[in-house]
From Swiss-Prot:
InterPro entries: Peptidase_C15, Peptidase_C15-like, Peptidase_C15-like_sf, PGP-I_bact-type. Its main location: cytoplasm. The active site is at E80, C143, H166. Its EC number is 3.4.19.3. It is an enzyme of class 3 (hydrolase). It is found in: Cytoplasm. GO terms for biological process: proteolysis. Removes 5-oxoproline from various penultimate amino acid residues except L-proline. Keywords: Cytoplasm, Hydrolase, Protease, Thiol protease. Gene3D superfamilies: Peptidase C15, pyroglutamyl peptidase I-like. It catalyses: Release of an N-terminal pyroglutamyl group from a polypeptide, the second amino acid generally not being Pro. GO terms for molecular function: pyroglutamyl-peptidase activity. This is Pyrrolidone-carboxylate peptidase. It comes from Clavibacter michiganensis subsp. michiganensis (strain NCPPB 382).
């Protein structure tokens, strides 16, 4: 039976919750498929997140890794295509550290591509009536940092596939604000569809999912 590792982040930027962590726990708790789901929370801390991710990989020894993060302002689930070797933080992390134009990995390649079936995953989410797209940038904050480091670490795990998914706020974080959001049950359903599509597709489907901007 394959093992799937899902990671989410702790709260940051003044929020008291992070939907990425809540959502991956919901996926685990609702899961009834032919795979084991493990979840781990990662810190929003550039200095500590590397060791936390490496420890999770060593402990779980997964066949699939899907890291999940919050992108405030988006309205759809975004399955990321590429991670770049740049930390350029618009805001400080939870310790007050704010790297600007620093590499994620010294001497690492400029970018890594996801090894998830990203287009099949987007299609699977859409069949649930939930909007989803292939995203061409994971930003330059801790989400991209984790995505890049994950793919860098997976070079030594050729049998393990990995990638990153951005989600919007959930209802909990959006109350009393004008933030776009999805209900938590929608987020969990969408991420479950991503997991199932990944397990069902060893290679991706050939459909156009590019961007003109």
């Amino acid at each position: 039976m394959p093992t799937v590792l899902l990671t989410g982040f702790e709260p940051f930027d003044g929020d008291t919750s992070n939907p990425s962590w809540t959502a991956v726990q919901e996926v685990r708790d609702r899961w009834d498929g032919d795979a084991e789901i493990q979840v781990r929370q990662l810190p929003v801390d550039f200095a500590k997140v590397d060791d936390a991710l490496r420890a999770a990989l060593a402990e779980v020894d997964p066949d699939v890794v899907i890291s999940v993060g919050l992108a405030g302002g988006i309205e759809t689930l975004e399955v990321e295509r590429v991670a770049i070797n740049v930390d350029d933080a618009r805001i400080p992390d939870n310790t007050g550290f704010q790297p600007i134009d620093e590499p994620v990995v010294d001497g690492g390649p400029a970018a890594y591509f996801s090894t998830l079936p990203i287009k099949a995953a987007v299609a699977a989410v859409r069949t649930k009536g939930i909007p989803a797209v292939v995203s061409q940038t994971a930003g330059t904050y801790t989400c991209n940092h984790v995505f890049y480091l994950l793919m860098h670490e997976l070079r030594d795990r050729p049998g393990t596939r990995g990638g990153f998914v951005h989600i919007p706020y959930s209802t909990e974080e959006a109350i009393g604000t004008d933030r776009p959001y999805m209900r938590m049950d929608q987020l969990a359903t969408a991420l479950t569809a991503v997991v199932r599509a990944t397990l069902a597709n060893a290679t991706d489907v050939k459909v156009g999912s590019g961007s003109l901007d």
